[in-house]
Amino acid sequence: MLLAFVWILAWPVAAFPQQKNSKEEFLVLPGEIGRSGGRIAVSLRAEPKTLNPLIAAETPSREIIGVMQADLVHINRATQLTETALAKSWKISPDGLQYTLVLRRGLKFSDGFPLDADDVLFTFQVYLNEKVHAPQRDLLLFEGKPISVRKVDLQTIVFELPKPYGVAERLFDGLAILPKHLLEKPYEEGKIGQLGTLATPPNQWAGLGPFRLKEYVAGQRLVLESNPYYWKTDAKGNRLPYLDELVFLFVPSADAQVLRFQSGETELISRLSAENFSVLSREQKDYTMVDAGPGLEYNFLFFNLSEPGEKTSARTLQELKWFREVKFRQAVSAAIDREAIVRLVYQGRGSALWGLVPPGNRR
């Protein structure tokens, strides 16, 4: 899916050229100049549950949120390098404890409201609040101590870490910056986790990504339109994205996804099984199959090591005791025939993994 969306944002089709405000500091992308207009339809196996990054836990929601929101810095998934994004620059103190980020000037949320350091402070305040239960919170804790954030001016924010962390820049990728002007009141009322349902009116939700909400039809589709305030342009100054619309069709059957793709109803499939890859390769018509190589995603099995409660059953207590034994976990790992899974489930289109770093990660 990652490769699909990289292609979407670079493909020559959508954002009408607009006049740039001289005070706006855009991120200019190199490469071939595209043309404006068009839409891409993507089939999803499951309907997303929310547009709220604070509670999104399942893949469909996170995929859609990913094109509606933006990060302070960006990790290029192809090169694994850290790149500028909402922050145009950053500086690290000699002791590695302080990160000073400078925002691009003149940036706006998808509803036209300006972005500044107060939005960043508000965002991290929300993520760190235990009562919000944001999944991002654990990333911002170091041995139980939270990262601290302070504003220097409207464009400059200082982050202080409790201890040095070699890849701290990556903390700023994957943390969507929230619109304080829309969310501060519900946050203070303890209702921020209730926001961002799919039925949310488009004018009540905003992000910093290339697309914004346009339409939702339950059980059928979710339509996003290009963000007219997006902060990236091509080399000629045309505001991106090129696409006018990005449409997600809810197609729960994998076979139905293939049929819709072959009929031209969709241009992308969010997840493709090995069986359907073979079908599309065998019946290839007016489309091209490309092997993009190994990705960064992987499937894994993990053990529940949480502390038992007062009502934990005797059987669960025994299982937790097993899980805490290193030799038991090693035995389970050794018992899994990874090569057979690759051969039988993925038809050879996968790789056995014995650690946390997938073969697609070349660094």
Predicted region positions:
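Bacterial N-terminal signal peptides
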Residues: M1-P12
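Extracytoplasmic/periplasmic ligand-capture domains
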Residues: F16-E32, A78, R104-R137, I147-K151, ...
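N-terminal lobe/hinge region of extracytoplasmic solute-binding protein
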Residues: K20-F26, A41-P94, Q125, Q204-L208
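A structural "hinge/loop" feature
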Residues: L27, A46-R62, L86, F113, ...
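Small-molecule pocket liners
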Residues: I40, Q69-D71, Y99, Q220-L222, ...
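Acidic glycine-/aspartate-rich tracts in secreted/extracellular proteins
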Residues: E47-P48, G106-L107, P164-Y165
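A generic structural motif
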Residues: Y99-V102, Q155-L161, L222-E225
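Surface-exposed binding/hinge segments that line
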Residues: R137-E189, E215-V217
